[in-house]
Amino acid sequence: GVLVGWTKSGSRPIFDLVSGVSTGALQAPLAFLGPRYDALLEEVYTTTRTADIFKGNGIGVLVKAGLHKADPLRRRLDDIITDRMIAEIADAHREGRRLYIATTDLTNGRAVTWDMGRLAASDRPDARRAFIEIMLASAAPPGLVEPIPLPDPTNGIAVLHGDGGVMRPIVVDPAMLRGARKQTLWVIANGHV
């Protein structure tokens, strides 16, 4: 895709800030970590089959609010997002680089932006699992994939989250850019902008 081609051109920068929404949330950690993850990015996006990410919910669609279960994609992300990657993201965060992923809080009807580098650097014993669940939620279109319970950042109570693109298709907040050495903004969008 675009990132692999950009690397091959020799002009791809190391990004100071990466944000991801929807399927972009699945790509964001690999884009953030840089060209050494291009082969994995290319493999994931050229060999993944529908059966690797979706499983019918059967009668569960009546109570789970989604045609498909999130389990296959969760397992796939569990294979892709390693402890080493979490440690590398944490190191980059400590160096001042930032990784954000957006989800939609379906319970309260609001966008939530997660600081994934901060999570990776938190030393939480469940940081990797929480990281995967946030990625999963951002890529879970309401009605198609069952919502993902995540703790509300303000009170810790679990609420249902889904595709971040529902409320915020692009995550760019001017506050994210403050203090940046150089303010160049690249947007890679799948679909229509």
Where are these regions (language model features)?
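Catalytic nucleophile serine of serine hydrolases
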Residues: 21-22
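Hydrolases whose catalytic domains are alpha/beta-hydrolase-1, hotdog thioesterase
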Residues: 27-30
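Patatin-like phospholipase
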Residues: 1-17, 32-193
